[in-house]
């Protein structure tokens, strides 16, 4: 499970899975409930072309010929990526039916890896209370990850607790915690790994946490839960989100 800036990070993962595993057969199913699929493709173009999405989408100026040729070239490459998008919010049961259909149609009986990405959990069509909906969604994902060679990457939001003045002004409370994740109990228990991506700079924090880490142009990845390897840890990235990218420090 991943929380913010979630969509850019997950979008990068989806294409990297394909780019970095050229000898593997992969099927990627993305529930893009927060953003329509073509916007996700736009972010991929931004990352690969080193152009901001505002530049690519702008109606004020035309793209120069070289950039336009690159857009066409990369777009043709992306058409070959084994990635499918679901744009419309679904109930947990509807999501389960879609996952089962894709598994039976494209994966079952093959040696393909099946990757399910869900962005994001709180946009699921409700079947009752938020807690009831999240519990049912987690049941779906626990069942889905039992398919052979299947991984589930679900995205969620942080709540507003981390933005409180008490947290911002106390360096011992800067780091994300389990309770900062919306619907934390259901999502945390169902996940093998829980990762929080945090930009303390946008909260006005200049020195981050008890180690007084620099925040300028930094993004920190906190692994709060690691079922196989134990202790939590923090990874540091350079902020390259203008191009929908993160650079490992």
Residue ranges: model-predicted function:
Residues 7-11, 142-249:
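Phosphate-binding/switch region of NTP-binding enzymes
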Residues 56-63, 84, 124-134, 166-175:
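Flexible beta-alpha connector loops of hexameric P-loop NTPases
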Residues 1-5:
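Internal alpha/beta scaffold segment
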Residues 38, 65-68, 72, 96, ...:
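Amphipathic alpha-helical transducer elements in NTP-driven molecular machines
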Residues 83-146:
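Phosphate-binding/switch loop-helix module in NTP-utilizing enzymes
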Residues 36-42, 50-53, 124-127, 161-166, ...:
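Switch/connector loops and helix/strand junctions flanking conserved nucleotide-binding motifs
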Residues 9-111, 236:
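Cytosolic-facing regulatory segments adjacent to core modules
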């Amino acid at each position: 499970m991943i929380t913010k800036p979630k969509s850019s990070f997950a979008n990068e993962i989806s294409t990297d899975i394909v780019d970095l595993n050229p000898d593997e057969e992969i099927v990627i199913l993305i529930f893009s409930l927060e953003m329509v699929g073509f916007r996700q493709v736009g972010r991929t173009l931004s990352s690969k072309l080193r152009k901001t999405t505002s530049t690519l989408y702008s109606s004020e100026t035309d793209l120069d010929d070289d950039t336009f040729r690159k857009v066409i070239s990369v777009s043709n490459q992306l058409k070959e990526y084994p990635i499918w998008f679901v744009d419309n919010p679904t109930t947990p049961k509807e999501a389960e039916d879609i996952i089962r259909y894709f598994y039976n149609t494209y994966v079952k009986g093959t040696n393909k890896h099946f990757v399910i990405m869900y962005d994001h959990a709180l946009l699921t069509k409700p079947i009752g209370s938020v807690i009831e909906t999240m519990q049912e969604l987690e049941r779906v994902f626990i069942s889905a990850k039992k398919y052979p060679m299947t991984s589930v990457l679900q995205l969620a939001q942080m709540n507003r607790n981390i933005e409180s003045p008490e947290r911002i002004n106390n360096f011992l409370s800067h780091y994300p915690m389990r309770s900062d994740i919306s619907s934390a109990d259901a999502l945390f228990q169902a996940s093998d790994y829980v990762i929080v991506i945090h930009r303390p700079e946008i909260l006005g924090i200049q020195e981050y946490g008890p180690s007084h880490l620099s925040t300028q142009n930094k993004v920190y990845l906190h692994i709060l839960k690691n079922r196989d390897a134990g202790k939590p840890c923090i990874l540091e990235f350079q902020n390259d989100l203008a191009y929908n990218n993160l650079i490992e420090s």
